Amino acid sequence: MEVSSENVALFDMDGTLCDYHGKLLMDLKKLARRGEPEITSFRNLPDYARERADAIRASIEWWANLPRLRLGWDILEVAQGLGYRIMILTQGPRKNAAAWTGKKLWIDENLGEDIDVTITRDKGLVYGKTLVDDWPEYMDRWLRWRRNGLGVMPVNAENAGYTHPQVTRYDGTNLAEVREALEQRLVLARSLEDARRKGSQLGYRVR
């Protein structure tokens, strides 16, 4: 399938291509004291657990050595096979320079030094036809201005129950559904490009 260079698929890192949640939960468990409740979610962490998590994430090596997450790589391989232009879109913590450095090292090691990377505080500002991201707030922000955008979301405990008419959730069993959604987004992109081309010839603009 011939694909325009503008058919960009944006891929998140933490919880999408990297097993951020699994690794952090495992490392927090190692630091847990007897009698403390088990931590299973990162929402509403108690102060002591948040401080430990911050200490863990202060290491460049921690970010650089995060394990791959199979769900995200399944989607990546499908998008690559369809001819999407792959770009990494990840959030950069305000006060953690180690994360910025470690993420770039991870990208270089796992995806190569030539892949396009955007590290931002606001994913909603970044262009793409598709966003692959596990975090509902980031997905909603990106889709807010993109009535034709496609979201693909690797399923985890943090996004349980999330739904959106433009988002396909992937749990490891429905890769064919993900492929179809990605293919249909390319079909839509091509039809919109054709309409814009015809519109410009007739002197009006197609949105």
Can you describe what each PLM-predicted range is?
Residues 118-144:
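Conserved Lys-Pro-Asp/Glu-containing loop-to-beta segment of HAD-superfamily phosphomonoesterases
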Residues 187-207:
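C-terminal accessory extensions appended to soluble enzyme cores
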Residues 1-56:
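Active-site neighborhood of HAD-like aspartate-dependent phosphohydrolases
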Residues 85-87, 130, 150-152:
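A structural signal for isolated positions on well-ordered beta-strands in alpha/beta enzyme cores
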Residues 67, 72-102, 107:
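Substrate-recognition element of Asp-dependent hydrolases with the DxDx(T/V) motif
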Residues 134-174:
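Acidic, Mg2+-coordinating phosphoryl-transfer loop and its flanking beta/alpha structural elements
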Residues 103-118, 164-192:
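Structural recognition of alpha->loop->beta junctions
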Residues 7, 14, 115, 128-129:
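Conserved acidic residues
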